[in-house]
Amino acid sequence: MDIFEAISKRYSHKERFLPDPVPIEDLIKIAEAGLAAPTGNNTQNVKLVILPDREVLQPLSEIVSTDGTKTAPTAIALFTDSNMRGDGHNFDMENYSAATENMLLAVTSLGYASVWLDYPFFDQNTQKKVLELFNAPAGLRMHVLLPIGKPDGEGSRRSKLPYKERYFINKF
């Protein structure tokens, strides 16, 4: 699947997943796509934890309980390391966003589905629990969880405004 097809087919899968395993080779491809994303001042401060099977994902799904986390056979957790700064600036949001989008496109191109889960990690209590669960070193913060798997049925897709209504050439 080329990049433009992956972009047009990608959607946020908020429903259940099939229990079919995702091969570790595919998870590594997805992770490497994320780590290939640009980072501010080349800080490369994005860290990933690959959760290759349901048994490992189960404790996290008790902290972050959604249809996706409860049924996905695999997931990737995305962290940034605040100890790594570029010229005194914090590029965490830009860095993890670029990595996440690359991974979502890789997920789609490999025939899987996922959803960008970030809202649970704004809560300090949840943040503390996940950092303990992953035995994360000091300075790391979890930002995103991508449950990954084959969708259990066709996922709902939100309609988008026509692109021609949202881009302009030279001026508005």
Give a label for each model feature.
Residues 1-172:
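Acidic, surface-exposed loops and disordered segments
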